């Protein structure tokens, strides 16, 4: 009763104060409590050092959100590779560098969870029952189902389809209209997301489905994409316009896929070797005998296309911008491409999947772009059990989060010489190649979707690692390589401005700040 009486006395005293005094206490007390909590937290020797912050709950969100890599480096210089910070009410523990990659990417499933970290963000976009809205074992099998469309035989058929889509885009899109003009200005943040959607849908979903994809459909995917922002990560559902557009886009795209799935089932028009949709209609039964529902298949199709769209749209936008700043590199790429085609006695229409493997500068340009601009600058996992940081006294509590940033290592001079320079030829160096190889890269592990390298202790991991490693790396290189060679064969281009745009970190994907434009002109070999 003494505690209750004391509490009542405290409330009565507070109510007896003037309004100004009450407001002052309500405003000041959270700050005092916040500072006191941080001081007490810092006394615990088993806790990772925390970056000091003034504003309760908000924490270091501004510094991290505006320039994450600069924030990480500043913290590293003060605390070392392991530190924590407050991000909108969540304690994030960061472990930088290859040891951090190993610690987080290869953490035990029982200790960390991507599903718990991301489901509230991804489920409104992809839909229920897939990706992070299901047990991890289900996700591993879903990745295996999707890999049926990512075989070498499939890639061989994708190259001419991608090339045709890009050439048609050059002819028909207002940014180019190459039948009507020889030069113009194109915004890469308009052209590349659309080209990515059109080429990926043609390859993965088939010719008939591609015909139903127009610019309005690309806009629906853009509306979905806007659901991947920091505010969505914290507040999955708010009564705001971009949330409404996200939900409307999800319903329309899902209904479109469901209509096609129903048509194929009713007509019996199913060939598992034709495209991903047919493959999933035939090969989507889990090991325990449960079959994916048609709605789950439709949702998985959204996830597959969205996952690839992030990487390829941002990467192709960035390599166009960097190449615009280096005309000599464009000429070197053109020479590499045309020399190969001369040996074949043909033109760009004769370029094959096998030929793409014989273009080292093309592939190194993609590789260098992914180094400088890893699409996702941070990857999160929620800690499910107390997690000890190797070779330290630190223990990360259950309920906190761990954060890995391969993109930080990509852009650090600790691992790459002059990391701020776009230099595809760095990958011709044996030293650079060696630095990007994991210590145990020859070891493999199968999480349920095929064998992958177990090693993640590398400073270069553009497609992630561990059980959540992206399965679309080879498809990305096919898609990006075909897009790049089609641009190089048909155009020269330069920046429509003084320099390559800065990175927009306000979204969760590292896109160029707009305006991001190139001025293009036809080459003599232009085909359209």
Curated annotation (Swiss-Prot):
<dbReference type="GO" id="GO:0097038">
    <property type="term" value="C:perinuclear endoplasmic reticulum"/>
</dbReference>
<dbReference type="GO" id="GO:0016020">
    <property type="term" value="C:membrane"/>
</dbReference>
<dbReference type="InterPro" id="IPR036396">
    <property type="entry name" value="Cyt_P450_sf"/>
</dbReference>
<dbReference type="Pfam" id="PF00067">
    <property type="entry name" value="p450"/>
</dbReference>
<dbReference type="InterPro" id="IPR050529">
    <property type="entry name" value="CYP450_sterol_14alpha_dmase"/>
</dbReference>
<dbReference type="InterPro" id="IPR002403">
    <property type="entry name" value="Cyt_P450_E_grp-IV"/>
</dbReference>
<dbReference type="GO" id="GO:0006696">
    <property type="term" value="P:ergosterol biosynthetic process"/>
</dbReference>
<keyword id="KW-0479">Metal-binding</keyword>
<protein>
    <recommendedName>
        <fullName>Lanosterol 14-alpha demethylase</fullName>
        <ecNumber>1.14.14.154</ecNumber>
    </recommendedName>
</protein>
<keyword id="KW-1207">Sterol metabolism</keyword>
<keyword id="KW-0472">Membrane</keyword>
<dbReference type="InterPro" id="IPR017972">
    <property type="entry name" value="Cyt_P450_CS"/>
</dbReference>
<keyword id="KW-0349">Heme</keyword>
<dbReference type="GO" id="GO:0008398">
    <property type="term" value="F:sterol 14-demethylase activity"/>
</dbReference>
<keyword id="KW-0560">Oxidoreductase</keyword>
<comment type="function">
    <text>Sterol 14alpha-demethylase that plays a critical role in the third module of ergosterol biosynthesis pathway, being ergosterol the major sterol component in fungal membranes that participates in a variety of functions. The third module or late pathway involves the ergosterol synthesis itself through consecutive reactions that mainly occur in the endoplasmic reticulum (ER) membrane. In filamentous fungi, during the initial step of this module, lanosterol (lanosta-8,24-dien-3beta-ol) can be metabolized to eburicol.</text>
</comment>
<comment type="similarity">
    <text>Belongs to the cytochrome P450 family.</text>
</comment>
<feature type="binding site" description="axial binding residue">
    <location>
        <position position="470"/>
    </location>
    <ligand>
        <name>heme</name>
    </ligand>
</feature>
<keyword id="KW-0756">Sterol biosynthesis</keyword>
<dbReference type="GO" id="GO:0005506">
    <property type="term" value="F:iron ion binding"/>
</dbReference>
<keyword id="KW-0503">Monooxygenase</keyword>
<dbReference type="GO" id="GO:0020037">
    <property type="term" value="F:heme binding"/>
</dbReference>
<dbReference type="GO" id="GO:0032541">
    <property type="term" value="C:cortical endoplasmic reticulum"/>
</dbReference>
<keyword id="KW-0753">Steroid metabolism</keyword>
<keyword id="KW-0444">Lipid biosynthesis</keyword>
<dbReference type="InterPro" id="IPR001128">
    <property type="entry name" value="Cyt_P450"/>
</dbReference>
<keyword id="KW-0752">Steroid biosynthesis</keyword>
<comment type="pathway">
    <text>Steroid biosynthesis; zymosterol biosynthesis; zymosterol from lanosterol: step 1/6.</text>
</comment>
<keyword id="KW-0408">Iron</keyword>
<keyword id="KW-0443">Lipid metabolism</keyword>
């Amino acid at each position: 009763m003494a505690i209750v009486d004391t509490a009542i006395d405290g409330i009565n005293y507070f109510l007896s104060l003037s309004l100004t005094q009450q407001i002052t206490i309500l405003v000041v007390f959270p700050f005092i409590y916040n500072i006191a909590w941080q001081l007490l937290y810092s006394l615990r020797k088993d806790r990772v050092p925390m970056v000091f912050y003034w504003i309760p709950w908000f924490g270091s969100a501004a510094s991290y959100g505006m320039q994450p890599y600069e924030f990480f480096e500043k913290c590293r210089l003060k605390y070392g590779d392991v530190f924590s910070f407050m991000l909108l009410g969540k304690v994030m523990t960061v472990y930088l560098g290859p040891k951090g990659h190993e610690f987080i990417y290869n953490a035990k499933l029982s200790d960390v969870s991507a599903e718990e970290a991301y489901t509230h963000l991804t489920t409104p976009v992809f839909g229920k029952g897939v990706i992070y809205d299901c047990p991890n074992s289900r996700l591993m099998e879903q990745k295996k189902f999707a890999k049926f469309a990512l075989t070498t035989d499939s890639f061989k058929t994708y190259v001419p389809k991608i090339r045709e889509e890009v050439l048609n885009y050059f002819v028909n899109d207002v940014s180019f209209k190459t039948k009507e003009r020889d030069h113009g200005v194109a915004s890469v943040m308009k052209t590349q997301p659309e080209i990515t959607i059109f080429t990926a849908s043609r390859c993965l979903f088939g010719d008939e489905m591609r015909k139903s994809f127009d610019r309005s459909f690309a806009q629906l995917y853009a509306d979905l994409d806007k659901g991947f922002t920091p505010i969505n990560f914290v507040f999955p559902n708010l009564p705001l316009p971009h949330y409404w557009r996200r939900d409307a886009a999800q319903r329309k795209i899902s209904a479109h896929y469901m209509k096609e799935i129903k048509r194929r089932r009713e007509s019996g028009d199913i060939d598992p070797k034709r495209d991903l949709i047919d493959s999933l209609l035939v090969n989507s039964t889990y090991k325990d005998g449960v079959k994916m529902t048609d709605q789950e298949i439709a949702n998985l199709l959204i996830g597959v296309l969205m996952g690839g769209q992030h990487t390829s749209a941002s990467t192709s936008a960035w390599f166009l911008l960097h190449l615009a700043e280096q005309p000599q590199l464009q000429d070197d790429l053109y020479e590499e491409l045309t020399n190969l085609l001369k040996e074949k006695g043909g033109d760009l229409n004769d370029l094959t999947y096998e030929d793409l493997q014989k273009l080292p500068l093309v592939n190194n340009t993609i590789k260098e772009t992914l180094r400088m601009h890893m699409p996702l600058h941070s990857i999160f996992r929620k800690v499910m059990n107390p997690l000890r940081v190797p070779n330290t006294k630190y223990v990360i509590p259950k309920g906190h989060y761990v954060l890995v940033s391969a993109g930080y290592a990509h852009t650090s001079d600790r691992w790459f010489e002059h990391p701020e320079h776009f230099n595809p030829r760095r990958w011709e160096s044996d030293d650079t190649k060696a630095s990007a190889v994991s210590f145990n890269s020859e070891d493999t592990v199968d999480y349920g979707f095929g064998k992958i390298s177990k090693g993640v202790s590398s400073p270069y991991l553009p497609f992630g690692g561990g059980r959540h490693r992206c399965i679309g790396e080879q498809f990305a290189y096919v898609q990006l390589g075909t897009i790049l060679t089609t641009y190089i064969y048909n155009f020269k281009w330069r920046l429509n401005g003084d320099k390559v745009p800065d990175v927009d970190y306000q979204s969760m994907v590292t896109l160029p700040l707009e305006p991001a434009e190139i001025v293009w002109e036809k080459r003599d070999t232009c085909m359209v």
